[in-house]
A protein has these predicted regions:
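Bacterial Sec-dependent N-terminal signal peptides
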Residues: 1-27
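N-terminal ligand-binding lobe of clamshell/alpha-beta domains
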Residues: 20-380
Length: 380
């Protein structure tokens, strides 16, 4: 009997111990599974592992038939064999060439603008900080986006070229890769969520070994954006809004799921084309726009126009809109850098909180007494 009792205790102990080990292993496995650190951006994934990150760009351009995966690897770290097929980038970067002005603020926010060695068409850059680097020759002009100077890029030998494509046919990207240059295809411009665009700062945090700083900065932007939304939450979206201007006999309005439409929604305004499905813009004839928006309370115009007189000269029919008659026309594209670059194009994707506050000040100025626009200007 004693023998049977001892055997029973042994069997029970065995199952308890193995059960505990199984649960313990399961818990460890759960805590060790790396997670995507991206919350808002729909076209970017960053999964952090020990010594390396797997970065995936899933929607690089409209109707893309491919996605791009990159391994950001720290020095002396061995990447698993299953990931060897992907492009490997050694981080942190010591030098970089970027090809969109939207990338410049991310570099400056992370204090790595001194790592920038080249940019196409440097006149487009508005930031005073980076302009100083350009003026002293630290940042070279490397051609134009559609025709980068490959010989100069080879001579510069940056650790990485961060660029973008516009469709499935990208001969310039192919030429860069054939030349032995390391290329990263980014797609912040494809994001339609205001916070989604801004979250691409985390990519640059990963490239320069500043993940914590990038997260801290982005979290502050999210908080600022959400606070602005709460400020206006009790307001009724009664102000009707017209968007856009004529371009070669076509009026392009922002679609209802676009970046611009999202700002107007969050600012509690009644955008007249909010029900137009899709992202990007829709070309309409003037008559159709006039019929729908003649009595709109506000008009967000496109272009760097400075005054109502200048605006009227562009198209005399603009004066038929109530927003023109009542002097309620604003543009976000009127402020230019020292060499003609548009500040809004450069800075707004990384600071959606400032864009939203500008919109709120247009539609609900009582909420922000004494506020000065960051981007917007009123046409007088």
């Amino acid at each position: 009997m004693k023998h049977l009792f001892s055997q029973s205790i042994f069997i029970l102990s065995f199952f308890l111990l193995t059960g505990c080990k199984k649960n313990e292993t399961t818990e460890i496995a759960k805590t060790e599974i790396p997670q995507n650190t991206i919350e808002y951006a729909s076209g970017l994934s960053i999964v952090k592992h020990e010594g390396y990150s797997v970065v995936t760009v899933t929607n690089p351009w409209p109707n893309a038939n491919k996605k791009f995966t990159y391994i950001l690897k720290e020095k002396d770290v061995k990447v698993p064999d299953s990931l060897q097929k992907y492009s490997t980038i050694k981080v942190p970067l010591e030098s970089v060439v970027v090809t969109s002005t939207t990338n410049i603020p991310f570099l400056e926010m992370l204090d790595v603008e001194d790592k920038l060695t080249g940019f196409p068409h440097t006149d487009y850059v508005s930031s005073e900080k980076t302009r100083k680097l350009i003026d002293k020759g630290a940042v070279k002009n490397v051609g134009q986006n559609e025709k980068l100077n490959i010989e100069q890029l080879i001579e510069l030998a940056p650790d990485l070229i961060v660029t973008f494509g516009v469709d499935n046919n990208n001969p310039m990207l192919d030429n860069l890769k054939k030349s032995g240059l390391n290329v990263f295809i980014q797609a912040d411009w494809m994001e339609q969520s205001p916070l989604g665009k801004a979250e691409w700062i985390k990519l640059y945090g990963a490239l320069f070994g500043k993940e914590d700083k990038a997260k801290e900065l982005f979290d502050k932007i999210v908080l600022s954006y959400e606070q602005a939304k709460k400020m206006v939450a009790a307001k009724q979206a009664t102000s009707t809004v017209l968007y856009g201007s004529m371009y070669e006999d076509v009026w392009y309005v922002a679609k209802g799921n676009s970046w611009v439409a999202q700002f107007m929604k969050d600012a509690r305004a009644n955008y007249l084309w909010a029900d137009l499905k899709g992202t990007g813009s829709e070309g309409l004839p003037f008559e159709k726009v006039l019929d729908k928006a003649k009595n709109a309370n506000f008009w967000i115009a496109t272009g760097s126009v400075k005054s109502l007189d200048e605006f009227a000269k562009m198209n005399p029919h603009y004066s038929e809109f109530d927003a023109f008659k009542n002097k309620r026309i604003y543009t976000f594209e009127g402020k230019l850098g020292a060499t003609g670059g548009t500040i809004y194009y450069e800075l707004s994707p990384s600071r959606p909180d400032l864009v939203l506050k500008d919109y709120i000040n247009i539609f609900h100025p009582d909420l922000l007494p004494g506020y000065e626009f960051t981007f917007a200007t009123k046409l007088n």
